[in-house]
Amino acid sequence: MIEKEETMENKQDELKIMPRGAAPRSVRRGKNMIAVASGKGGVGKTWFSITLAHALSGYKQKTLLFDGDLGLANVDIQLGLMVKDDLGSVIAGSKTLNQVIHHCDKTRFDIIAGRSGSAGLASMPIGRLQILGEDLSLLASSYNKVILDMGAGVEKPVRILSSMAEKIIVLCTDEPTSLTDAYAFIKIMAMQYPKSDLNVVVNQANSIREGQRTYDTLLKACTNFLKINPPLLGIIRRDTRVRDAIRNQTPLINRFPTSEAAEDV
């Protein structure tokens, strides 16, 4: 639990966020685009993005998963894929987004892989990031759902691309650092992009009841300090079979379709 909610409020000084009146220009949100973000790394964001995309494809939703995790891209690794072209090729200007789409047979959805170890997105000017987001918005019209697996933290690329999604899912766990950083992400997005549709998913909960307590702690801080109430979309219970699936580079829904975590997603 968070001992002092004021520690969340003090994150403003560390983030050096823009004043409310200095928000970036209005953005064009891509219909059917869902950004998955978290203030802290290590909360299972990429696994959740993959599993969500897999679940949607199982309901005959044409789905694209975009790996936007900056220099720590690993969607293709978790899926056991070897891709020739990735987002790095798009940033370099040698390929278009359409040309780096790969179909994953084992999950029945498409992916745009990131490039691990590359600072490409992090170093892109704001204008090019916005163009990339607009290209993604156009691409989204060819799909029922596009999942954006964003990097941890509140860096510029994460904020800009997340703002272009129709819905933002903030993933957190019960760890105090995860809750504090999730609050920081919600705060900066709410201030810079007040029309953002922010939602919460609690991951790795020991039980549904504990997951609800985790959400209530975050909600209390958001209500008291930000005057907003991001809704809870769901709680995913802690499941040791998730680690097994990741180690075997096999989607959880394929390997353990009746597991608690798979059912919760």
Give the positions of each predicted feature.
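Inter-motif core of Ras-like GTPase G domains
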Residues: 138-141, 155-176
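Extreme N-terminal, non-catalytic leader segments
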Residues: 1-40
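Beta-strand-loop-alpha "switch" segments that mediate conformational coupling across diverse proteins
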Residues: 225-256, 265
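Gly/Ala-rich phosphate-binding loop of Rossmann-like dinucleotide-binding domains
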Residues: 57, 162, 190
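G-domain G4 guanine-recognition motif of GTPases
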Residues: 173, 198-212, 235-242
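Walker A/P-loop phosphate-binding motif and the immediately C-terminal alpha-helix
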Residues: 29-69
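Conserved C-terminal guanine-recognition region of P-loop GTPase G domains, centered on the G4
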Residues: 180-193
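P-loop/Walker-type NTP enzyme "switch/lid" segment
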Residues: 65-141, 246-251
